[in-house]
Amino acid sequence: MLKPSSLPSPLAVPGLLRSFLGVRLPLPATYRKYSLTAPCPTCSVTRPSPKCWQPLSRRQFSKSPTILLHLSDTPEKPQNSSSTLEQSHQQEELKPDPDRDSNDSSSKPAEMVSPMGPKSKAEFTGSRSARATGGKAGRASKSDKLDAPQKLEPWQIQKQALKKKFPEGWNPRKRLHPDTLDVIRHLHQQDPKKYTTPFLAQEYKVSPEAIRRILKSKWQPSEEVIAERRERWERRHKRIWNQLAEIGVRPQRSKFADFSDTRILYGSRRTASSK
């Protein structure tokens, strides 16, 4: 709505603006012929016109006697009036129309909800489901490959067999010398209360179960087994000391070498013969 202060004088106001303001003045005959602008559509509803008014050309506008009369009365206001008319039209165009905005807003959601047709939407959903199923199939195939039993190497098979055979790890039992076994039996027979199973196990650093089996066993080796065992242990003794001699280790001298039977029996004769 235009402000009254910005309006020109009533003589310079055209018919269109007067119809907006509701002012109806008697117009001259020449004014009907040379009208400034065509009537507004809103005004045509209230005051229908018999014919559609066309805007005046520049030549007709300059030769109109009524307009010349108004220009002579107000020489400085024609430019202002034309500028105010243009500004009023621009303001009317720039004013937001609530009906038009509501129509636009009501139509936009429908467009946004269904931006694509049924065919494109079906294709989109189909491609999306295909991608999802393809990803699931790929993941399933990877999991199947991981779950499938792989071919083991020979060393892996041996390792699994050892783990199954020795779940607690490699812990071989301590093997005692046959003479030691005889000593254990002899001590237990001499004094069972003193040389008990826990005491003997702690003394020889074996388990009580091993001492119990040694005492329970009544097996005695034959002469042939004793001779074979003695040879085997002598070979083992020589092999070990030969390996130590190669790296520069000398054999340890026994603490009781001076009290051996040979020295006691034949030591005096050797000393006497030597003198």
Curated annotation (Swiss-Prot):
Residue segments, region Disordered: 71-154
Compositional bias annotation for Polar residues: 77-88
Keyword Mitochondrion: yes
Cellular component terms (Gene Ontology): mitochondrion; nucleus
A Pfam family it matches: Neugrin
Record bears the keyword Cell wall biogenesis/degradation: no
Span of the signal peptide: none
Subcellular location field: Mitochondrion
Primary location class: mitochondrion
Keywords: Mitochondrion, Transit peptide
Compositional bias (Basic and acidic residues): 89-103, 141-150
Presequence boundaries: 1-42
InterPro entries xrefs: NGRN/Rrg9
Family: Belongs to the RRG9 family.
Reported function: Required for respiratory activity and maintenance and expression of the mitochondrial genome.
Protein name: Required for respiratory growth protein 9, mitochondrial
Organism, as annotated: Paracoccidioides brasiliensis (strain Pb18)
Taxon lineage: Eukaryota, Fungi, Dikarya, Ascomycota, Pezizomycotina
Gene (name only): RRG9
